[in-house]
């Protein structure tokens, strides 16, 4: 296998906010030698209420910026972007771009036949998971619920708020009533709520976190392209946001185990701001 010089370049991971940290954690676990450029579009979250045209525009801007950072691969750590923009933007960039929908759908059909999907309003409306699941297994039944309050609650660090538990009960009730056996966490923010979801769901329901499966796919792609980093030395992770870097750092500390250094970036000028 030929290993290219670009193998030392970082992987780009992007989301609207801290949700993509669930993908970042999987990169650190499955690909510990890889450096990462993480971007959170916090100035424009939540994406779930945005129009498809807005989402596509944002993704183009982020990917152009990531090209300037010399990433060797981009992972859309955002189901809304994956559902609405992936197929459109792929043709315009000369680097592999991976999304969450297909890996998540394929994992779900391997777990059960009555599959629930919780996601943002935009992802649910796109029906991307319904199509991907039914293409993978025409016998599967899919039940979707949009959960618009989850992302703002997580970004506000209100996971342990009693209100969040009540909201989760309300969202999951129809899925429990139809007897799902599998639940796809169709937004990268939602694994942060796994503890709460487990309280509400029957014990036999399997949770599917697409983050682990998209990183598995990324690992296979890097192998095929000879771009996997086998470099000795410590891999780095650099954090960038479009909004308030201090706020992102404080919220993300819960999952990173430390306070990250976060820089603010202007997507329009591709220049770092102080």
Regions found by a protein language model. Name each.
Residues 1-274:
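Non-catalytic structural scaffold of enzyme domains
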């Amino acid at each position: 296998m030929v290993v290219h010089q670009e193998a030392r370049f970082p992987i780009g991971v992007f989301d609207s906010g801290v949700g993509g940290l669930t993908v970042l954690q999987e990169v650190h676990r499955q690909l510990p030698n890889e450096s990462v450029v993480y971007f959170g579009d916090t100035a424009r979250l939540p994406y779930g209420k945005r129009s498809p045209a807005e989402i596509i525009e944002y993704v183009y801007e982020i990917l152009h910026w990531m090209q300037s950072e010399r990433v060797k691969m981009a992972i859309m750590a955002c189901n809304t972007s994956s559902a609405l923009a992936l197929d459109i933007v792929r043709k315009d960039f000369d680097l592999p771009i991976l999304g969450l929908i297909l890996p998540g759908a394929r994992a779900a059909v391997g777990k059960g036949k009555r599959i629930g999907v919780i996601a943002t309003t935009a992802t649910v409306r796109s029906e991307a998971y319904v199509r991907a699941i039914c293409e993978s297994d025409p016998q599967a039944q899919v039940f979707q619920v949009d959960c618009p309050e989850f992302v703002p609650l997580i970004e506000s660090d209100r996971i342990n708020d009693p209100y969040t538990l009540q909201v989760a009960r309300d969202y999951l009730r129809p899925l429990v009533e139809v007897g799902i056996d599998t639940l796809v966490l169709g937004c990268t923010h939602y694994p942060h709520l796994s503890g709460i979801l487990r309280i509400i769901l029957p014990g036999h329901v399997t949770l599917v976190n697409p983050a682990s499966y998209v990183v598995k796919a990324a690992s296979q792609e890097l192998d095929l392209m000879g771009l996997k980093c086998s470099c000795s030395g410590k891999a780095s992770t650099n954090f960038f946001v479009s909004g308030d870097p201090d706020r992102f750092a404080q919220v993300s500390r819960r999952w990173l185990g430390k306070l990250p250094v976060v820089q603010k970036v202007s997507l329009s000028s591709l220049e770092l701001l102080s």
